[in-house]
Curated annotation (Swiss-Prot):
Name of the protein this chain belongs to: ATP synthase subunit delta
Ion transport among keywords: yes
Membrane topology: Peripheral membrane protein
Organism lineage string: Bacteria, Pseudomonadati, Bacteroidota, Bacteroidia, Bacteroidales
Coiled-coil positions: none
CC terms in the record's Gene Ontology section: plasma membrane; proton-transporting ATP synthase complex
Pfam families per record: OSCP (PF00213)
Location(s), subcellular: Cell inner membrane
Subunit-level organization: F-type ATPases have 2 components, F(1) - the catalytic core - and F(0) - the membrane proton channel. F(1) has five subunits: alpha(3), beta(3), gamma(1), delta(1), epsilon(1). F(0) has three main subunits: a(1), b(2) and c(10-14). The alpha and beta chains form an alternating ring which encloses part of the gamma chain. F(1) is attached to F(0) by a central stalk formed by the gamma and epsilon chains, while a peripheral stalk is formed by the delta and b chains.
Alphabetical list of InterPro entries matching this protein: ATP_synth_OSCP/delta_N_sf, ATPase_OSCP/dsu
Gene name linked to the record: atpH
Keyword Cell inner membrane: yes
Family, similarity comment: Belongs to the ATPase delta chain family.
Keywords, in A-Z order: ATP synthesis, Cell inner membrane, Cell membrane, CF(1), Hydrogen ion transport, Ion transport, Membrane, Transport
Reported function: F(1)F(0) ATP synthase produces ATP from ADP in the presence of a proton or sodium gradient. F-type ATPases consist of two structural domains, F(1) containing the extramembraneous catalytic core and F(0) containing the membrane proton channel, linked together by a central stalk and a peripheral stalk. During catalysis, ATP synthesis in the catalytic domain of F(1) is coupled via a rotary mechanism of the central stalk subunits to proton translocation. This protein is part of the stalk that links CF(0) to CF(1). It either transmits conformational changes from CF(0) to CF(1) or is implicated in proton conduction.
Amino acid sequence: MYIGVISMRYAKALLAYADEKGTEDTVYEEAGILADSFSRIPELRQALDNPVLPAETKLKLICEAAGGGKVSEELKRFVELVLEERREKFLQFMIMSYIDLYRKQKNISVGKITTVCPVAEEVVNRIRALVVEKTHGTVEFKTKIDPKLEGGFIFEIGTYRLDASVANQIKRVKQQFIAKNRRIV
């Protein structure tokens, strides 16, 4: 079976189970923390792939990574099922699929603002209001600091990207000079 098929089946099952219990929001928060742990700590994935570690140890590891040991009963039971079925190597993909399914169900868009210096909360809230108005859903924002931009910002949401950075403007001017003169300036 393909990774995507397996992870999507388990993610749909987790979403249905969490919906039934009314804890889909809590599971979503824990899944976000766990997904972040997978990306920040590559050893976590290696530990899950290790056949020598017992399932109880893997369960404790995952619970610790998902919220300091205080995870919801639904997520804990889901992880127990995954470990029982020996599908732990797909767990990261299952969690990412759950996050995607939850966002689709709740109409949540994820936006990213990249700037040279930290952005004031007031500016983020104004951008959030504009995006909510256009998408008719909620928006989660991530901010990133990148000194290579030299000024301006890059805003991304879904497949849309608005690059208003100074670095991009300099690049476009340089391309125009090259196109006109047929030589590098």
